[in-house]
Design a protein with these regions (language model features):
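Extended ligand-binding groove/face enriched in aromatic
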Residues: 1-68
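Well-ordered alpha-helical scaffold segments within catalytic/enzyme domains
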Residues: 4-19, 69-83, 127-141
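Carbohydrate-binding/catalytic loop surfaces
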Residues: 1, 43-65, 106-127, 131, ...
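A contiguous pocket-lining binding segment that forms or flanks enzyme active sites
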Residues: 55-86, 90
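Terminal, non-catalytic domain-edge segments
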Residues: 80, 125-182
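Long, well-ordered core segments of solenoidal/helical folds
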Residues: 25-45, 85-109, 146-163, 173
Length: 182
């Protein structure tokens, strides 16, 4: 999600320049995490827990890497400002991630690309693995760390890699048949 990535980048720029306008810009941009999709934000609720959408519209895309980037941006914003408002948005999102993590999990081996109905391509999966590892470390949430470890490509045997590749090909092609052409 660009909001989270941009917040993280602007916080780092602020640390280099001392320009407080950058922090104000981050806080203004972070307000989308407090608004529902219907109200022009990125906030949704699933199973009673908050999630942040990379693509805020219906049907909900539920793209994992965008959600993870949003959490890292909120973490950076809170760490810099100490504003409990952003800590609360971060905590709500982490609780939503923990409660809904199975949604993005393929048999404890790989990650799904949101609601698109196919497994993540390898480069997206590696990104999900790394971001989830970072969030597990930042939060101390063991469930995030365990899931990240289960997604480690280097820990997969030949049969698991073959299964993942075949399921990826099948689900990717099936999704292409379902999705309307632009």
């Amino acid at each position: 999600m660009y909001q989270g990535v941009v917040i993280s980048a602007l916080i780092r720029a602020y640390r280099m320049t001392g320009d407080r306008d950058l922090v104000a810009l981050c806080e203004a941009g972070a307000r989308v995490f407090e608004k529902t999709v219907e109200a022009g934000g990125v906030r949704t609720v699933e199973r009673g827990k908050v999630l942040y959408e990379e693509y805020p519209g219906y049907p909900l895309a539920r793209v994992l890497d965008g959600f993870l980037f949003s959490l890292l941006g909120l973490h950076d914003l809170y760490a810099e400002t100490g504003n409990g408002r952003w800590r609360e948005r971060f905590n709500e999102g982490v609780a939503g991630l923990v409660a809904n993590l199975d949604y993005w999990d393929y048999r404890g081996k790989w990650s799904w690309y949101g609601s698109h109905g196919y497994l993540c391509p390898p480069h997206y999966h590696k990104l999900n693995y790394l971001l989830l590892s970072i969030l597990g470390e930042l939060t101390g949430e063991e469930v995030l760390t365990r899931r990240a470890r289960s997604w480690d490509v280097n820990a997969k045997g030949r049969l698991d890699r073959m299964e993942i590749y075949l399921v990826y090909l099948i689900t990717q092609n099936a999704a292409r048949l379902r999705l309307p052409r632009q």
